[in-house]
UniProtKB/Swiss-Prot annotation:
Belongs to the ADP-ribosylglycohydrolase family. Binds 2 magnesium ions per subunit. Mg(2+) 2 binds at E27, D295, D297, T298. Monomer. Keywords: Chromosome, Cytoplasm, DNA damage, DNA repair, Hydrolase, Magnesium, Metal-binding, Mitochondrion, Nucleus. It is found in: Nucleus; Cytoplasm; Chromosome; Mitochondrion matrix. ADP-ribosylhydrolase that preferentially hydrolyzes the scissile alpha-O-linkage attached to the anomeric C1'' position of ADP-ribose and acts on different substrates, such as proteins ADP-ribosylated on serine and threonine, free poly(ADP-ribose) and O-acetyl-ADP-D-ribose. Specifically acts as a serine mono-ADP-ribosylhydrolase by mediating the removal of mono-ADP-ribose attached to serine residues on proteins, thereby playing a key role in DNA damage response. Serine ADP-ribosylation of proteins constitutes the primary form of ADP-ribosylation of proteins in response to DNA damage. This is ADP-ribosylhydrolase ARH3.
Amino acid sequence: MMAAGVSRFRGSLLGALLGDCIGAVFEGHTNVTKEFLFDYMKSLDKGERLKRVLTYTDDTAMARSIVQSVLENYEFNIEDLANRFTTEYNRDPDRGYGMAVVHVFEKLGSGEYKHVFSPAREQFDGKGSYGNGAAMRVVGISLAYPRIPDIIEYARTSGMLTHASSLGYNGAILQALAVHYALQGELAPETFLDQLLDHMKEVETDKKSRSDALELEMDEFPYCNKLRKIKAFLAREDVTRKDIVKELGNGIQAFESVPTAIYSFLRCLKPVSELPSELTNLQRTIAFCILLGGDTDTIATMAAAIAGAYHGEEQIPLNWKLSAEGYKDAEDWGEKLHQLYCRRLQSTTS
């Protein structure tokens, strides 16, 4: 396996950043009109937003912590990551963190817990969170580790810091795998989905994954079922936004947002009739996610992380990039992650 070019690494981090920043403007809107969205995007094109920088949310704040941790610790270090999450929250708490994860950070910072996973396991009467917080921040794992077993292990482990339910951390695994395969370049959507399905079948066969799904009165293998639904949707020309929200979701649960992000990326590989033809694939992906409503910042950040890894930074207009808080860090870290990825790849093949 050859390493992808640095443009894909920078593109993935910049895409994730822009998906979060732009998606946050529309989060929670029940009916985002195309006219309003397109006018907003035109203002970005013209540079009208440069005077007032678009700020990122907790999605990017935690993604930044993962990136910094994997860059500064050659071996994955869960204690370091836990400390970074807590320190970053205490430094800048007004990023839109949910109360559940705030309680985890408060407990981690108290010094009263011997194991870093214990606070997350106490959440929701011991069931743990199955939200999308673990998935929204995981992009750095995919960009630091070329081997599938490492991606799965570290996506799971990093997720378990805040999401003890397998439905939460399995969503992080799926998102991390999607970014990984997007990094590899040209790939037929069906092949892309088949590869994800092969891995998620194995991930979802463990006892906890099956019991967690049944406890929520879901079918076994919820992520595999969603991936099959994506396949079916891609084979149709008449899929509406209402269909997507009903079958894939647009909520804060991981299983109602990670599959939606993957579908949005794949759907936007081709022109979408209701979106302006002049948009790049990556811009189209962000716009498509926003029009679905709901948890727009998180779905857009995940979808754009995948799209950026696939298409590269060339698809990001300069004024879009310049409008986002932290874009220089994303560029710099993308280059450093590319170097780290290449070193690891070389060590596995030598």
